Amino acid sequence: MAAPRRYFPGIVRALLGAWQVGSHAGREWVSPPGSLLGNHVRCVSCVVGATFSGPLLASASSRYGQDSALDRILGFPQPDSSLVPCVPAVSVHRDEQNLLLVHTPDMPENPRVLRVVLLGAPNAGKSTLSNQLLGRKVFPVSKKVHTTRCQALGVITEKETQVILLDTPGIISPVKQKRHHLELSLLEDPWKSMESADLVVVLVDVSDKWTRSRLSPQVLQCLTKFSQVPSILVLNKVDCLKQKSVLLELTAALTEGVVNGKMLNVRQAFRSRPSTHCPGPETEDPNTHAVRSPQRTGWPYFQEIFMLSALNNKDVNTLKQYLLTQAQPGPWEFHSGVLTSQTPEEICANKIREKLLEYLPEEVPYSVQQKTVIWEEGPSGELVIQQNLLVPKESHVRILIGQKGLLISQIAQEVSQDLMDIFLCDVLLRLSVKLLK
């Protein structure tokens, strides 16, 4: 499959496909009038794509208008770096992505590296923050819990420094994992990622008044077991708080009044530094860490505190610059063209699942099975994707299709736009909803 053409964001075409009834998965049959749902296999397709007229050139950089890592490997001439975006695109080809992941890193003379684990309760905003730090929305995000089902990896490469982000599922207890029949990866991945971490970012959603005043027992257990790993505290979604004084109380509670081994004068720090990066405390208390309470609700070993709104990108760059400064001399793990370890098919499936979680009620999105049946180049050079969405109940079929097919059309259109932003190419997506038998 040749690489799809570069897309033009201003030209997006959405077509609602025909209603389909029949047992032939590869064909489209129009249903009889007045019989939208019968006793056959039901499915509805929605096609969303974009068109762009222009020549298909030889190298990826000329096609995409960006610096292609594979072009650098193959020796293609590169455009002026000042005219191209810094964030690499993800290849639409699995083989190219895998080749890039195992390719020898193009390290500078003095490389620096940092492995960062994002830790927090479910739905704290870890994936949203990861996307903001990376500069592309490669990780799925929704308001429902357990959107991230397994550990995902993102890579930030700037000049001599490479920061590797490990976006883990929300940390849960074994009891909850068994009770809700959740994947074992939701329980194990946060702990496994800590074994190779250089820095831990603990994320707390301050908009949740029920959980914001204390770290979860699972997070505290993880921090305690890996206490040798440096950690920082990030208070997320601070823009949701009407009374900023609440931040002072939360900071004191979540740090037990101690940051970087010193007593934290929260009020003085907040008055002297109105920015969202709280400076280290002023006076030292060497005996603070000697007491370990079994009822601990905070962690007194955080090196720094950051307050930000990941959704609005407020002060995310401040955190990013801090991470870059914490990198230590060492070899890079990935080529500078790597943005994520996910395959293009995984990114697509996760993006579709993100929209299902966002728009479908209650348990419905968790019952949907996804199956990609087409991933190929279209007649105009676009990336053509077809994915079947299998649901167990007729009522779920109707919910997912929506009135006159508007919901499935909206989902396909939004996913297509997200994929075009990630792959930097035309995307023609077809979603078919079918009753699982």
From Swiss-Prot:
Residues bound to GTP: 120-127, 167-171, 236-239
GO cellular component: mitochondrial inner membrane; mitochondrial matrix
InterPro entries in the record: G_ERA_dom, GTP-bd, GTPase_Era-like, KH_dom-like_a/b, KH_dom_type_2, KH_sf_prok-type, P-loop_NTPase, Small_GTP-bd
Transmembrane segments: none
Transit peptide: 1-20
Stretches for region G1: 120-127
Entry keyword ATP-binding: no
Region (G5): 308-310
UniProt KW keywords: GTP-binding, Membrane, Mitochondrion, Mitochondrion inner membrane, Nucleotide-binding, Phosphoprotein, Ribosome biogenesis, RNA-binding, rRNA-binding, Transit peptide
Coiled-coil annotated spans: none
Entry-linked PROSITE patterns: G_ERA (PS51713)
Compartments (UniProt record): Mitochondrion matrix; Mitochondrion inner membrane
Region (Disordered): 272-293
Region G4, residue ranges: 236-239
GO molecular function: GTP binding; ribosomal small subunit binding; rRNA binding
Domain Era-type G: residue ranges: 112-330
Keyword Mitochondrion carried by entry: yes
Domain KH type-2: 360-437
Region listing for G2, in residue ranges: 146-150
Membrane topology (UniProt): Peripheral membrane protein
Assigned protein family: Belongs to the TRAFAC class TrmE-Era-EngA-EngB-Septin-like GTPase superfamily. Era GTPase family.
Function: Probable GTPase that plays a role in the mitochondrial ribosomal small subunit assembly. Specifically binds the 12S mitochondrial rRNA (12S mt-rRNA) to a 33 nucleotide section delineating the 3' terminal stem-loop region. May act as a chaperone that protects the 12S mt-rRNA on the 28S mitoribosomal subunit during ribosomal small subunit assembly.
Protein name, as recorded: GTPase Era, mitochondrial
The encoding gene: Eral1
